[in-house]
Amino acid sequence: AAFGGNPDNITIMGQSAGAMSSHVLTFSPLATPMIHQAILQSGSIACFPSPMVFTKAQAQAVTDKFYELCGVSSIEEVRRLPAEDLLDKSDELMTLYPSLPFRPVVDGHILPDTPDVLTKEGGMAHIPYLMGVTKDDLFIPEGASHREGGFFTAAVSFANACRKQNLPVYLYEFCHDLPGSDDGAFHSSELWYTFGTLNRCWRPMTDEDHALAEEMVTCWTSFMKQGDPNEDVKEEWKAWTEEGGFIKTFA
């Protein structure tokens, strides 16, 4: 509210790891009363086969290892370390835990259980969701459908669970190949369009690109305002249903 926003209409939004962070908030009883919509782009707390959360014991083990690398024994000592040292030791920790050493922790309070269990129990925030992927997220190898990839599978799985709770979910796929590149619709490529910042991109954007960006900005802002992306749009974006399923394509 101090910045002119509406505290009674809060949308959390994230992309990739940011989407995972946003998603986990929708499972916390401390956060859900303050959240009214969620936008999750190319990421989900359940997007990989291994659980993306730690038990308290696992988190303590990682913390102990980090203390060891830093040569300290308490959080107070960590806080006194130079930022450069923290970055160096964090990079070193990543080599020991390549599948992300820093994760949400199931502590029974902030996060009462794992997201997969809470999803099955209907324990997600009962709000509208907008979520999707890019066509070439994570560069799925040729011959394998990107629809088999973790991001897409997680989005559809979560959408199905939400529908059982009568929660609207709007799924999308960003299929637009960016100009000036043969990398297709790669991971993060949609961000120039959803934020309407094409003029800050070095690529030779065309009128077609600007029109697509305008369409996406309209949908995203409409969803933020009212939990429905269909205000002032040319084509209706239908919510997901288990029976037929609808995924809007941005191409």
Model regions: which residues?
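A general structural signal marking secondary-structure boundaries and capping sites
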Residues: 29, 70, 82, 227-228
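Non-transmembrane alpha-helical segments in soluble domains
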Residues: 23, 63-67, 75-79, 87, ...
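Serine-hydrolase-like catalytic core of hydrolytic proteins
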Residues: 1-72, 118-139, 148, 162-167
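Short Gly/aromatic-enriched secondary-structure transition segments
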Residues: 144-145, 236
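Accessory cap/linker subdomain of secreted extracellular hydrolases
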Residues: 60-96, 100-103
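Mobile gating loops/cap/lid regions near enzyme active sites that modulate substrate access
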Residues: 136, 153-156, 160-251
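Surface-exposed patches in mature extracellular/periplasmic domains of secreted proteins
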Residues: 8-10, 72-81, 171-173, 231-239
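Serine-hydrolase catalytic core
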Residues: 89-90, 101-140, 146-174, 179, ...
